[in-house]
Amino acid sequence: MPRKTSHEHDHGLVVETSKPEVAPPPRYQVLLLNDDYTPMDFVVTVLQQFFNLELERATQVMLHVHTRGRGVCGVYSREVAESKVAQVNEFSRMNQHPLLCTMEQA
């Protein structure tokens, strides 16, 4: 006598499968913090080099940081944001500037 598989016992049974709802990963804002020592042109260079901003947009962000105390450079996944923060802070120290970059959940 042939063995029956579990599928053969389930005649007429319909199983609905659904994909689990997966929330998108959280996004993080990368911020520059104003200080009284870092030259404005250095901040613009950082924005262009690390955040791929055009000169006009980099200048706008730099002025926002200068007048408001901090400004958003971009919004990224956690890993990318952490990497950008580390790169900017290291670049600032290597160039002997106190410019600080940080991140917070968007």
UniProtKB/Swiss-Prot annotation:
Chain residue ranges for the region called Disordered: 1-21
Source organism superkingdom: Bacteria
Basic and acidic residues compositional bias, start-end: 1-13
UniProt-listed InterPro entries: ClpS, ClpS_core, Ribosomal_bL12_C/ClpS-like
One of the GO biological process terms: protein catabolic process
Role according to the record: Involved in the modulation of the specificity of the ClpAP-mediated ATP-dependent protein degradation.
UniProt family annotation: Belongs to the ClpS family.
Assembly: Binds to the N-terminal domain of the chaperone ClpA.
Protein name, entry field: ATP-dependent Clp protease adapter protein ClpS
Organism the protein comes from: Xanthomonas campestris pv. campestris (strain ATCC 33913 / DSM 3586 / NCPPB 528 / LMG 568 / P 25)
